[in-house]
Curated annotation (Swiss-Prot):
GO CC terms: plasma membrane
Keyword annotations: Cell inner membrane, Cell membrane, Ion channel, Ion transport, Membrane, Transmembrane, Transmembrane helix, Transport
Organism lineage string: Bacteria, Pseudomonadati, Pseudomonadota, Betaproteobacteria, Burkholderiales
Record carries keyword Cell membrane: yes
Encoding gene, per UniProt annotation: mscL
Protein name per Swiss-Prot or TrEMBL: Large-conductance mechanosensitive channel
Function: Channel that opens in response to stretch forces in the membrane lipid bilayer. May participate in the regulation of osmotic pressure changes within the cell.
Protein's organism: Delftia acidovorans (strain DSM 14801 / SPH-1)
Length: 142
């Protein structure tokens, strides 16, 4: 079997195709979760805690050159070490929401799998030679 034939068989197997579809849908779903976190949840969290923009929360760890604006971007461009925890808060909330949504989806899928009882396996077909041997045995008993 040639290498191309083996690759074709590998690529069209159900698991590989399912994985590819999952990655594509996961990427799109990640954008939806990012939007939910950034556009819906973080503004509410920011309103509760009095800070609407978490991306500019940071602690300066080094000396700031004179004339440098005290924004995260300006400090990073100036090479000042900063502990930028605001973006981490946003990413952590994003992860928690995504993990919870995936958990709920898996939970529902598992529930649906349990509800659908497996169809009983059909009785195995007795091979023809066994049937013939049984007939011979039964005729000898008479």
């Amino acid at each position: 079997m040639g290498m191309m034939q083996e690759f074709r068989e590998f690529a069209v197997k159900g698991n590989v195709v399912d994985l590819a579809v999952g990655v594509i849908i996961g990427g799109a779903f990640g954008k939806i979760v990012d939007s939910v976190v950034n556009d819906l949840i973080m503004p509410v969290v920011g309103l509760v805690f009095g800070k609407l923009d978490f991306s500019n929360l940071f602690v300066v760890l080094g000396s700031v050159p004179p004339g440098t604006a005290m924004t995260l971007d300006a400090l990073k461009k100036a090479g000042v070490p900063v502990f930028a925890y605001g973006n981490f808060i946003t990413v952590a909330v994003n992860f928690i929401i995504l993990a919870f949504i995936i958990f709920m989806m898996v939970k529902q899928i598992n529930r649906l799998r349990r509800e659908a009882p497996a169809a009983p396996a059909p009785a195995p077909v007795t091979p023809e030679d066994i049937v013939l041997l049984r007939e011979i045995r039964d005729s000898l008993k008479r």
